[in-house]
Amino acid sequence: MLLEQQKQLISLIQAAVAQCLPEAQAQVQLERPKVAAHGDIATNVAMQLAKPARRNPRELAQGIVDALMAQPQARELIQDAEIAGPGFINFRLTPAARQAVVQAVASQADAYGRAPRNGEKVLVEFVSANPTGPLHVGHARQAALGDAICRLYDASGWDVTREFYYNDAGNQIDNLAISVQARGRGIAPDAPDYPADGYKGDYIVEIARDFAARKSVQASDGQPVTATGDLDSLDDIRAFAVAYLRREQDLDLQAFGLAFDNYFLESSLYASGRVQETVDTLVAKGHTYEEGGALWLRTTELGTGDDKDRVMRKSEGGYTYFVPDVAYHKVKWERGFHHAVNIQGSDHHGTVARVRAGLQGLAGIPKDFPAYVLHKMVKVMRGGEEVKISKRAGSYVTMRDLIDWVGRDAVRYFLIQRRADTEFVFDIDLALSKSDENPVYYIQYAHARICTMIGNSGASAAEIAQADTALLTAPSEYALLQRLAEFPQVVALAAQELAPHHVAFWLRDCASDFHAWYNAERVLVDEPALKLARLRLAATTRQVLANGLALLGVSAPDRM
């Protein structure tokens, strides 16, 4: 049922309730029955109102139905209504109401499922990897989730900025530099004098080789960095290695089809004095104290749910990792992004309350800023066994490995199809299979099958566009029409909950409904009018499948 139709039906039900219970304030909710035989849409409004009104719920439901069906507008939407169980009202739509989605999709095309611009802006930060190695499968899940959430925000009318925060300051960067230095001097990772916390992947050898060759590298948002070849200068090695890996990560993201609007460097917060300013402000406002030679933030007093106070400056000097995060999010707020979303691994759960506490102490920024989507681990399986190691990365499967093995469409869909807060097993064999069990193949095949069907039909686009949808009355056609009408509400729900898996589920279900219809009803029948009507339903399905796939960053192929 189209959203506009739902709004109209809710208004009509409220008017019917007012006739039965003039004093009642009806909060009408509609839902799709779990069993198709029970109708197209249902409400429990009679059950909600019966007890306070001291009425029998079934009798009240019947009164609401009688008052509703006396309205001419209701009869245009509702074919019949029945009372079920303790007082549910189940509605069946008129054929015209069911078929209205075809014209809605035809008139809106790519915009079907999208909302008008709302004048709001949001910053979504994701991937945000340390520039110390190739992007891994966890980063791939962030990339898939983050880009899909950005696309959902855009479809919901928001002005979206994609941002990548580089953790380019701290011990991990020093460990990168000494690792490259060691490999440049011919020290192998298994040698006793190799740095204890050094990185061991083959990519370290590649960096050392290019540093010795005095090559130049350039990240997408930076200036070229030319290697000096001086293995005694850790500063030179550090600058080249960071630029090298940032470029490598850029290439991984390009292979994934992902472009960021902005890159923000952690080091810039130190260089600009924003980290020190953050600490000084929290001290001046009385939100800190000294103990054991360390500086502590009174997070337990700042109302964000932290269970103990947190160290900001360690006793041996240097700030803990959440301090620059507080400074960074203060900068986000000052840039005018009062809506911000961070997509991070679930191992960052402990930082949420700390960052929000720091922001409360700094400027009284709302306690729910920023919003977080925390995702769990990805396990990669192949041939029934877990894949743990990539030769190039040394200790983990990379994002590029996944893309090379199964293609970016499968990577994106598979990493989105489950709730972010659940662990996910990425089955390489399943992602490569050409079967109904592979959801991305199943969905893309539905789109390609429609393209082939229309191409072989001999009908022109104009003939299909003018077909009479009143002929679409088969049960499988009604089921498919109902699914297509749900799409805008699914998009809105996915955006509201920051949960793109809702779209992935819908796409799978829509493909299933299409294949069921295709197998139940011949499309290219001898009767010209019916043939064109069914081709029009197929074309409508193709459009909405393409719209849904686009929200996930997945292609809609014409041929497979």
Swiss-Prot record:
Belongs to the class-I aminoacyl-tRNA synthetase family. GO terms for molecular function: arginine-tRNA ligase activity; ATP binding. PANTHER family: ARGININE--TRNA LIGASE, CYTOPLASMIC, ARGINYL-TRNA SYNTHETASE. Monomer. This is Arginine--tRNA ligase. Pfam families: Arg_tRNA_synt_N, DALR_1, tRNA-synt_1d. The keyword Membrane does not apply. It comes from Bordetella pertussis (strain Tohama I / ATCC BAA-589 / NCTC 13251). A motif ('HIGH' region) lies at residues 164-174. One of its GO terms (cellular component) is cytoplasm. It is found in: Cytoplasm.
